Amino acid sequence: LEAESRCLSWTELEFLVRDKSRRPLLERARLMGLPVSIPYDAEVPIKWQDDLFTANRTNHSPDDLKVLDFSSLWAGPLCSHLLLNLGCKVVKVESRNRGDISGSATPRLFSVLNKDKELLIVDFQNEAELESLRQMICDADIVIEGSRPRAFEALGIDRRSIRSQQTSAQHHNQLWLSLTAYGRFGAAAAWVGFGDDVAASAGVLDRSSDGGYGFVGDAIADPLAGLQAALTVKECLTRNLRGLLDFSLFRAARIALETVERLYDSPLAPLKKVRTRC
């Protein structure tokens, strides 16, 4: 914002933002790794780059499937929680130095989503532990990745690196779910996003008759992504498909919005009063 003071009130912040062009401000915020968005952003890529193929073995019962879940917060843990309820064995992988912050921020939600999963704590700075983890990834039936791709690439546990260590059978029978804010390819792969701002970017917003905007629910793109990702994984298992699912919070929010508007054959009606939240 190029402000002289680092301590701004909300009133001062609103005044500074009001005089700025949206797109340059958004681009600068993204360079700084901030979760910022423009409502109904038409420049966000909406082409999903899934890479799916038919598995080279017959379908297995969910009871026979092992899920490695590297995600945190809400979307990924909700997805693996639903897969657990289907019968899959789920192992939640956490960093020894940086665990899932939702455990302290929202302990009740964390307990509901993760209480019946096996917990694996890994020191990502320890090469021996990393190598053991790589072998676990090779053997897993489903991998849930909840970080931007470059984080896994830096550790050598990304899908391409793991592929070089897998047998053909392991690779062709593994489903890799990539859960990101805006997708894993192109410039959008580096963008930071959370449930509220990504939903706004997709157009999932409260709208008042005077043109104002407000959030819908609480970080609504997160549960939408978790639910839709679990349904998509289940569909892949039913159809014996494996490979890569490029799933994002933005994709889930857009699908939900377009589905509701298609069902009602019109854009969502504006609300009488916008609910705002800071």
Model-inferred region functions:
Residues 10-33, 42-278:
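N-terminal helix-loop segment corresponding to the beta1-alpha1 unit
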